[in-house]
Curated annotation (Swiss-Prot):
GO biological process assignments: respiratory electron transport chain
Subunit structure: Complex I is composed of 45 different subunits.
N6-succinyllysine modifications at: K98
Keywords from the named record: Acetylation, Electron transport, Membrane, Mitochondrion, Mitochondrion inner membrane, Phosphoprotein, Respiratory chain, Transport
Bilayer disposition of the protein: Peripheral membrane protein
Main location: mitochondrion
GO cellular component: mitochondrial inner membrane; mitochondrion; respiratory chain complex I
Chain positions with N6-acetyllysine modification: K30, K46, K60, K98
Localization, UniProt: Mitochondrion inner membrane
InterPro entries per record: NDUFA5
Function summary: Accessory subunit of the mitochondrial membrane respiratory chain NADH dehydrogenase (Complex I), that is believed not to be involved in catalysis. Complex I functions in the transfer of electrons from NADH to the respiratory chain. The immediate electron acceptor for the enzyme is believed to be ubiquinone.
Protein name: NADH dehydrogenase [ubiquinone] 1 alpha subcomplex subunit 5
Length: 116
C-alpha cells in the first residue's frame, strides 16, 4: 500500500503531494528555524515549538502515509501540509507583530468589563 499513490484528494484546489514526508520535514524545520527568532519565554514559541517537534518526530518515525495521517489527526496528508504552510506563514508574521512586547499604551480600565 505504501507504493500506491492516490489520484486525488477529493478536495477542490488541493493537489496530491507525491513526497509528503519530505515536504513536511522541510516545512517543520523551517517553522522551527523561524521560531528561533522569537524570545524563548514567548508563549507562541514555547507551544508551537513543542507541537512542531512532536509532529516532526512522527513524520520521521512513520514511513506509511495512511498511518501518519492517523497519528497526526489533521485530515489527509495534503491538509496537514497546508496547515504546516499556514503555521510557517503565521510564525513569520508573529516576528513582525512582536506580541511578546509590552503594549504601547495601557488599555482603558473598563476594557474587559461586560456588560458596560
Amino acid at each position: 500500500m505504501a507504493g500506491l499513490l492516490k489520484k486525488t484528494t477529493g478536495l477542490v484546489g488541493l493537489a496530491v503531494c507525491e513526497t509528503p514526508h519530505e515536504r513536511l520535514k522541510i516545512l517543520y524545520t523551517k517553522i522551527l528555524d523561524v521560531l528561533g527568532h522569537i524570545p524563548k519565554n514567548a508563549a507562541y514559541r514555547k507551544y508551537t515549538e513543542q507541537i512542531t517537534n512532536e509532529k516532526l518526530s512522527m513524520v520521521k518515525a512513520e514511513p506509511d502515509v495512511k498511518k501518519l495521517e492517523e497519528r497526526l489527526q489533521g485530515g489527509q496528508i495534503e491538509e496537514v501540509i497546508l496547515q504546516a504552510e499556514n503555521e510557517l506563514s503565521l510564525a513569520r508574521k508573529m516576528i513582525q507583530w512582536k506580541p511578546w512586547e509590552p503594549l504601547v499604551e495601557e488599555p482603558p480600565a473598563s476594557q474587559w468589563k461586560w456588560p458596560i
